[in-house]
C-alpha cells in the first residue's frame, strides 16, 4: 500500500529530481486535508454497521430480484457473501481515504475481482450500485456533521466505480 506522500516521493526519486512546486502543492493539499481524512475515517469506523445495513437495504429495495430464486443473493450463503463484499469495499475505501491514494484498491480489491465475478456470473451492476450507495450514505453523514470535503470520500469510491464500470478490463 502506498500513501500520497510515498507516491509523490517515489515519482521524483525515480527521475532523480528535487521536489518542485507541483509536488509541494500536492503535499500541502494532502497534509491540509489530514484532519478531515481522520474525521471521515472515524465516522466510517463508528458507523460501519449502520452504513452497511442501510446500503444493503437500499440495494435490495431497488433490486429485489437479487433476493429471488435465481438472483445472485438468493440463499443465505450468497446473501452473506454479498454483504461480506460490500463490507470489503467500505473497509478498503476507508484505507485509501486515509492514505490519500487508491493504490490499495487496485492491489487488494480490483486486481482479479472483475474476472472472478464474471467467472462466477456475479453481475457487476449491483456491485457498482452498492459502492455508489456506500458513497451516498457517507456523504449524507458528512453533511450532518458539517464536513464539507466530499472530494476526500469521492476519490476512492469513484475509483472503484470507474474501474468496475469499464468494459475492457
From Swiss-Prot:
It comes from the Eukaryota. The modification N4-methylasparagine is found at residue 72. GO terms for cellular component: chloroplast thylakoid membrane; phycobilisome. GO terms for biological process: photosynthesis. This is Allophycocyanin subunit beta-18. Keywords: Antenna complex, Bile pigment, Chloroplast, Chromophore, Electron transport, Membrane, Methylation, Photosynthesis, Phycobilisome, Plastid, Thylakoid, Transport. Heterodimer of an alpha and a beta chain. The lineage of its organism: Eukaryota, Rhodophyta, Bangiophyceae, Bangiales, Bangiaceae. It comes from Porphyra purpurea. The gene is apcF.
Amino acid at each position: 500500500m502506498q500513501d500520497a506522500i510515498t507516491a509523490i516521493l517515489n515519482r521524483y526519486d525515480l527521475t532523480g529530481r528535487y521536489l518542485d512546486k507541483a509536488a509541494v502543492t500536492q503535499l500541502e493539499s494532502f497534509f491540509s486535508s489530514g484532519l478531515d481524512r481522520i474525521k471521515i475515517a472515524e465516522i466510517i469506523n463508528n458507523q460501519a454497521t449502520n452504513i452497511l445495513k442501510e446500503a444493503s437495504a437500499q440495494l435490495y429495495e431497488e433490486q429485489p430480484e437479487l433476493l429471488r430464486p435465481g438472483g445472485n443473493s438468493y440463499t443465505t450463503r450468497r446473501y452473506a457473501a454479498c454483504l461480506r463484499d460490500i463490507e470489503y469495499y467500505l473497509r478498503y475505501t476507508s484505507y485509501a481515504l486515509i492514505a490519500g491514494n487508491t493504490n490499495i484498491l487496485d492491489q487488494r480489491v480490483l486486481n482479479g475481482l472483475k474476472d472472478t465475478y464474471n467467472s462466477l456470473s456475479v453481475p457487476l451492476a449491483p456491485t457498482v450500485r452498492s459502492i455508489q450507495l456506500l458513497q451516498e450514505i457517507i456523504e449524507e453523514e458528512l453533511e450532518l456533521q458539517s464536513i464539507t470535503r466530499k472530494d476526500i470520500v469521492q476519490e476512492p469510491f469513484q475509483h472503484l466505480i470507474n474501474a468496475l464500470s469499464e468494459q475492457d478490463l
